Amino acid sequence: MSLMNLPEESRPREKLLALGPKSLTDAELLAIFLRTGIKGMNAIELADKLLKEFGSLRKLLGSNENEFCSHKGLGTAKFAQLQAVVEMTERYLFEKIEKEDALTSPEHTKRYLTRILRDRHREAFYVLFLDNQHRVLKGEVLFEGTIDAAAVYPREVVKRSIDYNAAAIILAHNHPSGVAEPSQADRRITKRISDAVELVDIRVLDHFVIGDGEIVSFAERGWI
């Protein structure tokens, strides 16, 4: 059935305008992005099918071009649109933490870091550089690979912190396994970085480990 044949209150776009985006299901939100369906399926039916094939909305959003375009109804134009949406989301979240104290707005910081790191297939070590009022100056992936393989160099963190004239930093990295519990290697590298930056009067305020649906804070554990 075409979306135009549905009652107006059941059409995703009209429903969003009347009740707000939170009233929509994942399939309805995706249908608005897709705009059209394929032969034999309207946009909602196609969206529902795609969500089942990918496993979740998050996995769809985190898919690469080959994965995305291998599904019927999706192509390079839609992939480009999706990447634009994802990038706008990341910039929006970064703007929110950039204008606020990263410590007094920890949920915004966690949301941003989760968005940046959660769906990466390799470990990535990310640093937020803060001024003396704990406002964000810059965020950057400094290292990629396995943290346990000594891929994180404290001297590089010190160098970048000085480059940005940072007074404090927040560390973060992901666990592709999905388990956010910090390892002993995570704790060792945190101490090494903390000791290194303290020599130039810079503080590590926290280290977040991002898993699948969970995030662990070293500061909340009392480890920093």
Swiss-Prot record:
Q: Where in this protein would one find the motif JAMM motif, according to its record?
A: 173-186
Locate the residues binding Zn(2+): H173, H175, D186
Keywords assigned by UniProt?
Hydrolase, Metal-binding, Metalloprotease, Protease, Zinc
Instruction: State whether keyword Metal-binding applies.
Output: yes
The MPN domain is annotated at: 102-224
Q: Which GO terms describe its molecular function?
A: metal ion binding; metallopeptidase activity
Domain of life of the organism in this record? Bacteria
* GO terms for biological process, alphabetical: proteolysis
Q: Check the record and name the InterPro entries matching this protein.
A: MPN, RadC_JAB, RuvA_2-like, UPF0758, UPF0758_CS, UPF0758_N
The UniProt family comment states: Belongs to the UPF0758 family.
Q: What's the protein name? A: UPF0758 protein VSAL_I0192
